[in-house]
């Protein structure tokens, strides 16, 4: 396959090149490649970069295919420019043993249009009491997490980190102290009081992060914090890094884009975990991205049926979708307004993910994997959930106008998504 008239970023500047793909690798990047008998695609001077890597998605299968399937989720991710994703273990069965993990791997092998690497659970059934068969499944999983739940016992988390260190696998944590949730459904603050909805305080997250950073230091383990949301959490991670503790973290697009002040009414589409916090928290997250405290952006794509999201904030399920809109929203809100550079955003969504987790992806260079996304930076669309490839329609961002639209995604050398109105084969 030959991609003609590609506009890539080289040392902060755009450069026009052609890209030759052989099998699953990039064979050559050069000006005016002339090869006969190749599938040639003219991308017409659109921006081309390494495919995005999402370290946090909920693909729901096996167990919850009413919400999403591996096939629909992978198509949605490809449409958003993602070529590699890591799938969370809150499934049925939970991938906590070789037997249960293999069920998920078989579905991924048969149905996914992009590269998908599963997480293994930290504890059996994600109950937080007994470690999963970590040694048995380590070679087949990306890392270990009980995402969806915080590991409540410090001792269990410490034992998991010791095992993670032994296996050279990261321990990835959804941080939430159950004793501090107190029946809350959104951030505890002025807005929750105005809406009459029980709130979840920021310390529910930050205290567990602080605990785990010290445990990671003791265990010499790579500790990665999921979907960081509070200013105190950013401070804890920043201090951990200053002390050379092996801590990394991610932020979601929605926590960068919005705060609790944007919740104008009791609408379940705004319910997510962790919740959107205050304006100061959002500003701290943006500052954390800019100063490198926050390493990567991950979507936390969490599809639900509409029935689960139309009950108001207190009774609706936690979670919003993000695979198809992450880059477009971030490009529109942060790159076009000169808060982030395009190069920074791309790194946050690809190269940095590969770097912190030691993956051989996230590069647009010769001999690297042919994971590529072509983006029309000028094209504008209006977000329409009814047009999503995901089964999930649960987003509060419907009708938002965005630029920077992926029109072609190539994963492992194969076309995973193509906008046939924009790209001619």
Q: Where do the language-model regions lie?
A:
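Histidine/acidic residue-rich metal-binding segments in metalloenzymes
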Residues: 131-297
């Amino acid at each position: 396959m030959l991609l003609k008239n590609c506009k890539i970023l080289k040392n902060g500047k755009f450069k026009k090149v052609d890209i030759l793909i052989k099998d699953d690798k990039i064979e050559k990047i050069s000006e005016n490649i002339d090869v006969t008998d190749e599938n040639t695609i003219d991308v017409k001077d659109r921006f081309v970069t390494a495919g995005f890597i999402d370290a946090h998605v909920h693909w729901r299968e096996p167990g919850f295919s009413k919400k999403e399937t591996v096939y629909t989720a992978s198509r949605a991710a490809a449409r958003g420019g993602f070529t590699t994703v890591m799938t969370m273990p809150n499934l049925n069965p939970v991938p906590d043993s070789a037997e249960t993990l293999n069920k998920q791997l078989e579905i991924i092998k048969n149905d996914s249009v992009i590269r998908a690497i599963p997480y293994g659970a930290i504890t059996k059934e994600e109950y937080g009491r007994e470690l999963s068969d970590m040694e048995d499944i380590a070679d087949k999983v990306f890392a270990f997490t009980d995402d969806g739940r915080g590991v409540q016992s410090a001792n269990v988390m410490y034992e998991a980190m010791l095992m993670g260190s032994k296996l050279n696998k990261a321990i990835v944590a959804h941080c939430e102290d159950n004793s501090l949730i107190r029946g809350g459904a959104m951030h505890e603050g002025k807005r929750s009081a105005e809406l009459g909805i029980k709130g979840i305080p920021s310390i529910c997250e930050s205290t567990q992060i602080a605990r785990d950073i010290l445990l990671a230091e003791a265990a010499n383990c790579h500790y990665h914090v999921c979907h960081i949301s509070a200013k105190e959490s950013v401070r804890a991670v920043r201090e951990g890094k200053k002390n050379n503790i092996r801590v990394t973290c991610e932020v979601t697009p929605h926590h960068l884009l919005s705060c609790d002040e944007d919740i104008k009414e009791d609408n379940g589409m705004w319910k997510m975990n962790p919740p959107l916090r205050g304006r100061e928290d959002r500003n701290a997250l943006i500052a954390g991205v800019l100063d490198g405290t926050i390493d990567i952006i991950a979507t936390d794509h969490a599809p639900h049926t509409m029935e689960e999201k139309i009950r108001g904030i207190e009774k609706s399920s936690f979670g919003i979708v993000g695979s198809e809109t992450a880059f477009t929203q971030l490009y529109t809100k942060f790159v076009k307004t000169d808060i982030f550079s395009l190069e920074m955003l791309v790194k946050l969504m690809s190269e940095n993910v590969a770097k912190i987790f030691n993956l051989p992806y996230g590069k647009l260079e010769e001999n690297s994997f042919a994971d590529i996304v072509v983006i029309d930076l000028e094209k504008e669309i209006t977000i329409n959930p009814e047009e999503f490839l995901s089964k999930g329609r649960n987003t509060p961002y419907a009708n938002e106008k965005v630029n920077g639209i992926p029109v072609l995604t190539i994963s492992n050398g194969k076309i995973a998504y193509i906008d046939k109105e924009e790209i001619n084969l």
